UniProtKB/Swiss-Prot annotation:
Keywords: Cytoplasm, Leucine-rich repeat, Methylation, Phosphoprotein, Repeat, Synapse. LRR repeats lie at residues 23-44, 47-68, 70-91, 93-114, 116-137, 139-161, 162-183, 185-206, 208-229, 231-253, 254-275, 277-298, 300-321, 323-344, 346-367, 369-391, 392-413. GO terms for molecular function: protein kinase binding. Belongs to the LAP (LRR and PDZ) protein family. Residues 663-676, 872-882, 1243-1263 have a biased composition (Basic and acidic residues). Residues 677-709, 1332-1354 have a biased composition (Polar residues). The modification Phosphoserine is found at S439, S441, S443, S850, S869, S947, S949, S1118, S1233, S1335, S1439. Coiled coil: none annotated. This is Leucine-rich repeat-containing protein 7.
Amino acid sequence: MTTKRKIIGRLVPCRCFRGEEEIISVLDYSHCSLQQVPKEVFNFERTLEELYLDANQIEELPKQLFNCQALRKLSIPDNDLSNLPTTIASLVNLKELDISKNGVQEFPENIKCCKCLTIIEASVNPISKLPDGFTQLLNLTQLYLNDAFLEFLPANFGRLVKLRILELRENHLKTLPKSMHKLAQLERLDLGNNEFGELPEVLDQIQNLRELWMDNNALQVLPGSIGKLKMLVYLDMSKNRIETVDMDISGCEALEDLLLSSNMLQQLPDSIGLLKKLTTLKVDDNQLTMLPNTIGNLSLLEEFDCSCNELESLPSTIGYLHSLRTLAVDENFLPELPREIGSCKNVTVMSLRSNKLEFLPEEIGQMQKLRVLNLSDNRLKNLPFSFTKLKELAALWLSDNQSKALIPLQTEAHPETKQRVLTNYMFPQQPRGDEDFQSDSDSFNPTLWEEQRQQRMTVAFEFEDKKEDDENAGKVKDLSCQAPWERGQRGITLQPARLSGDCCTPWARCDQQIQDMPVPQNDPQLAWGCISGLQQERSMCTPLPVAAQSTTLPSLSGRQVEINLKRYPTPYPEDLKNMVKSVQNLVGKPSHGVRVENSNPTANTEQTVKEKYEHKWPVAPKEITVEDSFVHPANEMRIGELHPSLAETPLYPPKLVLLGKDKKESTDESEVDKTHCLNNSVSSGTYSDYSPSQASSGSSNTRVKVGSLQTTAKDAVHNSLWGNRIAPSFPQPLDSKPLLSQREAVPPGNIPQRPDRLPMSDTFTDNWTDGSHYDNTGFVAEETTAENANSNPLLSSKSRSTSSHGRRPLIRQDRIVGVPLELEQSTHRHTPETEVPPSNPWQNWTRTPSPFEDRTAFPSKLETTPTTSPLPERKEHIKESTEIPSPFSPGVPWEYHDSNPNRSLSNVFSQIHCRPESSKGVISISKSTERLSPLMKDIKSNKFKKSQSIDEIDIGTYKVYNIPLENYASGSDHLGSHERPDKMLGPEHGMSSMSRSQSVPMLDDEMLTYGSSKGPQQQKASMTKKVYQFDQSFNPQGSVEVKAEKRIPPPFQHNPEYVQQASKNIAKDLISPRAYRGYPPMEQMFSFSQPSVNEDAVVNAQFASQGARAGFLRRADSLVSATEMAMFRRVNEPHELPPTDRYGRPPYRGGLDRQSSVTVTESQFLKRNGRYEDEHPSYQEVKAQAGSFPVKNLTQRRPLSARSYSTESYGASQTRPVSARPTMAALLEKIPSDYNLGNYGDKPSDNSDLKTRPTPVKGEESCGKMPADWRQQLLRHIEARRLDRNAAYKHNTVNLGMLPYGGISAMHAGRSMTLNLQTKSKFDHQELPLQKTPSQQSNILDNGQEDVSPSGQWNPYPLGRRDVPPDTITKKAGSHIQTLMGSQSLQHRSREQQPYEGNINKVTIQQFQSPLPIQIPSSQATRGPQPGRCLIQTKGQRSMDGYPEQFCVRIEKNPGLGFSISGGISGQGNPFKPSDKGIFVTRVQPDGPASNLLQPGDKILQANGHSFVHMEHEKAVLLLKSFQNTVDLVIQRELTV
């Protein structure tokens, strides 16, 4: 406004003095929050020449505006225009038009009438094509169409002969029209981020071209024809797949900048020396083994970057580069430098990081202008004395964790040559790389790595008992596991943040840093404080000012403490690419199933390999080793890929993650320690600089189980990685609590059992370990409730943008299955052995948990989960479990469970049965590595789709603020039963810092308490919770202590209308879980088992509804920042609480109740599996909350052009925090329409619900915003309708097999099949209601369920088909399940608040009602046969349009099956979810046997008990053909609401 006034003031002097009115020619209304063009503009329509309306909210241009005939410049960028009116043709004098960052979908044909147009800026609009009339704008000189949806240009585009600048970045162009050769005046052409597979032929005919961008395409060759562009000055060919550069490139005589970064070059042509004017040459991140000698001819070269290659020597001619100022040769294999290097006297910055230098030439002292020299991660024993001549040297990096730029050097005599040399305590350097790399190469997952890299600031500490921590605080132990760290290496010194761009390889640095040398504990260098500081987990949580590198401190108790403090400044590009490359190479190698103890050796062996590749990307070999050791080699590799379980690590500063284990775990501690070391190393790898993917790798590793305890520890570590990932995902400080790592908790192995926290049963540990195998490694929050919050900021601080670049693809691929917070269950866990240990819920929902599970969500192979498990068979088991419930023996499918079926059961039940045992909140995130891998692929190909909007990417991080998650914690508990609390604990510790601090509401103190094994905490949790209130920026404004019973209402009121609005705004696409890709819904992410049925059930239940909401939030989280999610969740939760209270208050309603709760648990598991029934509601909640936030149009949310626009500027950017994390509103925009379903109520719990998505439960959530009664009514109504529709199937639906939790049900079945019957009997009355009219049924269910479960009403988070355990399971669980369910439901309630349970109950009841359930538990196959269709849909992981629901469909061959399939491992992919390698139905014969049962897009999860999740296409076809007449399919369908 001030600008406007200024201009008007300037142009309109007081009329008193002027006899006539001043001529107004310029009006500027920029940034005035206008919703329409001000009317006063029309007063000057005769004289107005320039009108600026930038950055307002104008949705349409009034007709009067086009009467301004004199208008020459019209600037309306960053508004809400959806179209350009045809009346624009009347602006015949218009010369400049700027409509960028709007929602304009096309130019009107008659824009051709604006003959004077010379500049058109229309970037960041969904323009799919240009009208023919556009080519008649013959005066056009500048055209900017970046970030549109153009797939082609008009054939006569060459008519625009006056074009000088043409920018078409970030479109979908594959070719250029041949007429473009007429653009003789074209000087700048930007074709970056398109889909060119080869250089367009027409390019070499545009002779006047001076600047050409072709980066981020799919070029494989740089043809010689480019040499015809004699005027070319700037050429960017980076991020393609170029393998060869033609000799004729030398024809570009004027070329000054040549960018070939991130390609696949193995050599450069000698003719490159003929580019005499070259000043910048970048060939980093390729596969060069040598440089041509002719490079010395580039006498004007000022910047030369050949980092991240495979160079073993530099040519001596490099001495001729007298103009060179910057030389980067990082991450190569140089054993020495040529003496001629001293002739490069103008070099000011030289980086030689991560090579194999053992000495430096004396001539280096001649480089008098050298100011920055990075020698970290080499093998130097000393420095030449000539270094004393470098008077301008300001920074000398000798290690990655160096705390000061310059460290004093002492003069010494060389022992052998007696020459004077310079040394200091950092010599001799220990190569970090060799050992570290080995392990990495095997289990290393590129995608995970990338994520981890982004996560590079994570710190994972494993502490034994606090006492031990305190005692050993100052001591650094070298563990054999620490091999990567070099036992003899000196203590770690924190190194300052890297110089501008130098990236330190995480491992090497860490290793080096962790050298024998004692670490000066008081040394300021240790930013975190002395290693002893490690003990102070909280302090550890504090962000490290220095660039912390992942360092592994031998943990005090012989555990390794891994601190990933390194912040690598370098963004994804080169390092990441290199890392990816290395990783890919590594991944290619089979992972060794190495023991943790062996991991060092493994690491070494792998390291060598890795070193080769990873030198540039040092991975924590340990990490791989860990994985390897836990997982079987071949599988391991895949597992790494599958590691998707690792949540993508947003690019947040790593948090300190405390990997805590119960004492029990410590029993295996030695092994565990090793494992931990490995894990830690893995973690460090995970946290390492380039560790974005690494983190996920680490997480994957976490899955690996060394021993149950080890696994736990490992899991803890991995989980910590997970947590880190997640934490980055959910940066928001959950509680005031410091990160778990910060917390006082001791390393899981070492952690003494706190009185509060009971050690998890070994079984649980085993289970936990199993859980770790799953992508969704549970994170068990250590008891320390308050610790996470502090570290959260670190996570949150991680720049989203960092991850956003490559992240999006990852996110898409990753689906974080709900991460339940498993309350660590104390000894109480040992509930009746009779109970079948539930399969790890994590497993279930994580990766392969349920055949119904969205495979896409867990693209990684089911094997992955099992692979991670100590037993290779595990994979198969899991698969089996997914395939057939029966395979789930009392735990076989879930190996760990199997180990301690009782325990796992007890874990689950113990939560129910013993509240004394506080549950540990564990977050389990499952990310399929494959999902992640796409990102890697993208990175590798250097191709980032611009379609990946930053928002979406941003979504990757969850910013979760302290949302009381007591309920969640409870939910976790149930999870815990599957996942070992220990494991969970480990992860939670490792991850806890993450989970807690990061974003998991479950990290709430109370939540944590639940999650933690502390009984007292549980109680405490039940009593009070801290709720954070967030400001508009979603920054926690403070925490409020809330009693468990009543939660503080979220800052925003639930506004059903608003929610609906939000949902409206949300684009389904955005919403799809894929869109949320990397992030599991918060609720799921934080599923908390209720600590104990009795104590916390009510509280938990109350919070459970919130939790459920949280779930949806989580999902939204993927899009929304954790804080926003938290806010939403809070908002939703409080409303839901009342219903929860109603239903939840009586947490222990009875067997039925429990069963329903079990159902809930299962549903949660299912959710974890990727069915987010709750999530959807959560989404809805999110939407509703979004309502509270300004919601931008999808278009607004569109990503900005990479170059031209800031991420924020576009659309949602306003609402979205700068971090690029999409705001709640943005998320809401992206929330799947499913969420709308949420509005109508979550009744789906009913069998009908089972059939239909429980999405209605979301409705309930919305209801949460409305009066509880309304919600119930709505839910009932919906349910009644569903019941009517699905009544026939309801009983059938109940089949466990049908339930997504098939695995779980199997587990339960294993535990006690009797439950089915019992349940059935218990549910009989409910059954009757089901039999009644649907509406009646729903009422009955509501009532009964209400009675039974605290959330009698359908909770906003209905149990997805997946969420709800199969009836069979429930019934099976019968008594146990009741207990289990009770506990789980309590947990669920706590997390979902009773409503969820209610939903579950209803669903369960429905399921129970159907007799099928019992069968189903026996085997999924069994369930399959049951009803023609078991709509046990569970929320699918896809959130986009609908909820993926799972159905059982029985087809009778006649003569064939009547449908066609596509997809599969080796198939050509499917048109529905290209990233999903599952088997999809592509065509259904209209009259065929499947015509009424299947529809295109259905994903086949099972057929007659055979899992189709990771199956070869041919095998699937053969199987289907080989079946007899009846084929029972378990399919997943995205139901649109």
